[in-house]
């Protein structure tokens, strides 16, 4: 019997005016110009944080806060792609690999459609898979809630892990 694993992760960060003239948010490792940055201990990449939590959850390995606590100064400003590659190393070490990932970003702004392929390509590269196995979608909450008021951004990720038969 083939044992597949499914994981789900969610991450939220508040928008923050950092006082800089040019501000941006980082989503799936892609810097995107915006009116605000994100308030976070690391780079605040909600896409990669949700994805990393989904990968860890599929294997019951806790969450990114346990592996990268915000109380550790070494994690300040951490590039979330480094975090994701570390987590994926744990997936490979457990004998699994990514089947596919489906990620939804919830925000009114910034608009993400023009960044979709770059986000998917970064994730595919970090997870050693084809871009066709990575879905990134964006939606609004029709001006409802904290995302609708443009106070923050949220991402939800679902992953399917399959036994690693590739020898990687």
Swiss-Prot record:
Origin superkingdom: Bacteria
Q: Which UniProt keywords apply?
A: Isoprene biosynthesis, Lyase, Metal-binding
**Which residues does the annotation list for site: Transition state stabilizer?**
41, 140
**Broad EC category:** lyase
| One annotated GO molecular function | 2-C-methyl-D-erythritol 2,4-cyclodiphosphate synthase activity
Catalytic activity from the UniProt record: 4-CDP-2-C-methyl-D-erythritol 2-phosphate = 2-C-methyl-D-erythritol 2,4-cyclic diphosphate + CMP
Q: Which residues bind a divalent metal cation?
A: 11, 13, 49
Binding site residues for 4-CDP-2-C-methyl-D-erythritol 2-phosphate: 11-13, 41-42, 63-65, 68-72, 139-142, 146, 149
Nucleotide-binding recorded as keyword: no
Cited Gene3D superfamilies? 2-C-methyl-D-erythritol 2,4-cyclodiphosphate synthase
- Report any one BP term from Gene Ontology: isopentenyl diphosphate biosynthetic process, methylerythritol 4-phosphate pathway
The biological pathway it contributes to is:
Isoprenoid biosynthesis; isopentenyl diphosphate biosynthesis via DXP pathway; isopentenyl diphosphate from 1-deoxy-D-xylulose 5-phosphate: step 4/6
Q: Quote the record's cofactor note.
A: Binds 1 divalent metal cation per subunit.
EC number(s) of the enzyme?
A: 4.6.1.12
**What cofactor does this one take?**
a divalent metal cation
> One Pfam family name from the record?
YgbB
The protein's matches in InterPro entries, at most eight in alphabetical order, are given as: MECDP_synthase (IPR003526), MECDP_synthase_CS (IPR020555), MECDP_synthase_sf (IPR036571)
The protein's matches in HAMAP family, at most eight in alphabetical order, are given as: IspF (MF_00107)
Assigned protein family: Belongs to the IspF family.
| Assembly behavior | Homotrimer.
According to its UniProt entry, the function of this protein is described as: Involved in the biosynthesis of isopentenyl diphosphate (IPP) and dimethylallyl diphosphate (DMAPP), two major building blocks of isoprenoid compounds. Catalyzes the conversion of 4-diphosphocytidyl-2-C-methyl-D-erythritol 2-phosphate (CDP-ME2P) to 2-C-methyl-D-erythritol 2,4-cyclodiphosphate (ME-CPP) with a corresponding release of cytidine 5-monophosphate (CMP).
- Record's protein name: 2-C-methyl-D-erythritol 2,4-cyclodiphosphate synthase
